[in-house]
Amino acid sequence: MAQKEGLPAGRLSAMVIDEDKCHADSTSYMLSAELNFSVTVFTSPIKALDFLQNHAEGVDLVLADVHMEEMNGFDFLKVARELHKSIQVIMMSTETTMYTMKRCVKLGAQFLVNKPLDAGTIKNLWQYVDLKVLRMEKIKDLLQGIGDESTCANETNSLAENPKNDTKKKYYLMWTPHLQKKFLHALQILGKDASPKNIKKIMGVDNIDCRQIAAHLQKHRLRLTKDLKKASFTTDTSKDESNSRIGPAESHHVCRNASTLQPRSNTQPTETTMQILSEDAEYDDVYAAMRRALQYGIVFDESKHSSDPSGDEDEQVVVGGDQDGCANEANDIDSSGDHHQVAAVVTKPCNTNASQEIINKMTNSDGMQATKGSKAAVFRLVDYSESDSD
């Protein structure tokens, strides 16, 4: 049971101030049973203030009702805080409105709980109690055990017998700009042969070991790899952006230039071959026409078979007559008219290779004798006579 006067030592102490005696006793019982508090109950707020005035430092927690006839709960809270600034007060009220809670907190209360209190609320009261009180109690307990010489001697002996239990202190090395400069200089000298042991020799720093250098070397290489990947990604992105900036017109212009640069297909041999074939066919046609003219005794007009559109002078073949005095009859005609002679005269101001080739063909095929002149060529053909035929 809780005591109304005096505060027993060894446990956390609490005060319950409530004019409702039944509620005050039930609250005191739950505090003792659930939280192992040493509780003091007061039904008069004035007597509670007198007690606090003399024992304020020994009270850890105060639970006070807001609605009391002898003294208002807010006034009690204000005076109690003046007597002891670090005292922890939790207010109880049947009306837990926002206004009541704000006013309690403003005056220095830890929290406002709903009245009547139940076991669940009592169990959660420790959440509103400052843990500094509990820490102070633990400190007091530790301070009480310091004066025991036998305990200290036993602990000293155990540490001496088990030196492995003594943990080594770990310290972290900060890579200053000076160390980083030496580290990079060592890497530049060693190159591919860089190892933590060799780097340490070149750096010449005493307060550093190979493990720390190895860890820093690994981080340095990872950083370089990351920078290279980032640089390559940036380059690829810039190329894609430059290609995407080319518009349709520019791309068409580029394609057109590319097509201009491509070599054109050489069609000249094909055209030359076709021209030679057409000329050969033309020469054959002219040759056949001239033979027909000589055979049937008609005039050969080369203009009908000429393919030259430049308007050159036409070749003319005359059968059985004179041409500009350049050719005469080879034999006189007898009076009876039995002797006949056929002469062919070919005149051309421009002695072309085509006509010459045709004449040569005719001469070779028919056994003609050709005589060339400056202006025209006269060929003597076969004489036909009636006497020979008989």
From Swiss-Prot:
Stated name of the protein: Two-component response regulator ORR29
Origin superkingdom: Eukaryota
Region (Disordered): 233-271, 303-339
SMART domains: REC
Predominant localisation class: nucleus
Modification note: Two-component system major event consists of a His-to-Asp phosphorelay between a sensor histidine kinase (HK) and a response regulator (RR). In plants, the His-to-Asp phosphorelay involves an additional intermediate named Histidine-containing phosphotransfer protein (HPt). This multistep phosphorelay consists of a His-Asp-His-Asp sequential transfer of a phosphate group between first a His and an Asp of the HK protein, followed by the transfer to a conserved His of the HPt protein and finally the transfer to an Asp in the receiver domain of the RR protein.
Domain Response regulatory: 13-130
InterPro entries to which the protein is assigned, alphabetical: ARR-like, CheY-like_superfamily, Homeodomain-like_sf, Myb_dom_plants, Sig_transdc_resp-reg_receiver
4-aspartylphosphate carried by residues: D65
Listed Polar residues bias regions: 257-271
UniProt similarity note: Belongs to the ARR family. Type-B subfamily.
Function: Transcriptional activator that binds specific DNA sequence. Functions as a response regulator involved in His-to-Asp phosphorelay signal transduction system. Phosphorylation of the Asp residue in the receiver domain activates the ability of the protein to promote the transcription of target genes. May directly activate some type-A response regulators in response to cytokinins.
Cellular location(s): Nucleus
MF terms (GO), sorted A to Z: DNA binding
Pfam families noted in UniProt: Response_reg
Keywords, ordered alphabetically: Activator, Cytokinin signaling pathway, DNA-binding, Nucleus, Phosphoprotein, Transcription, Transcription regulation, Two-component regulatory system
Gene3D superfamilies: 3.40.50.2300, Homeodomain-like
Disulfide partners: none
A GO cellular component annotation in the UniProt record: nucleus
DNA-binding region residue numbers: 169-226
GO terms of biological process kind: cytokinin-activated signaling pathway; phosphorelay signal transduction system
